[in-house]
Amino acid sequence: MSTTPRQLALLAAETCDEKKAKDIVVLDVRKITTISDYFIVCSTSNERQARAIADDLRVRMKEIGKREMGVEGIEDARWVLQDFGDIVLHIFHESQREFYDIEGLWADAKQVRWKKPSKKS
């Protein structure tokens, strides 16, 4: 069974959430670029957390047959970029995210709901 790019993006967002990343956003960039189908953007409070997210996603993708095509910034872990072809994950330290403003640069991208709304009691 093949995994769609959207399913990969949702898996990445869920991985970020499980590792306690903040402000997770999934952007559908298919109509505005050919470099990838989806960008996933999240914030972390420290470098260890950023590396843990990247490591966990690499393992999960490998389990479903997706190979990491490239990774940048893992040493410093202030902005980690993980490229899986169909999706690109941007893991930002909180202090870097506002400065680089990926969501602003890709403002024409459609945001994808990735999390089920909480049930109200």
Which residues are covered by each model-predicted region?
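Active-site beta-strand termini and strand-to-loop segments that position acidic
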Residues: 82-84
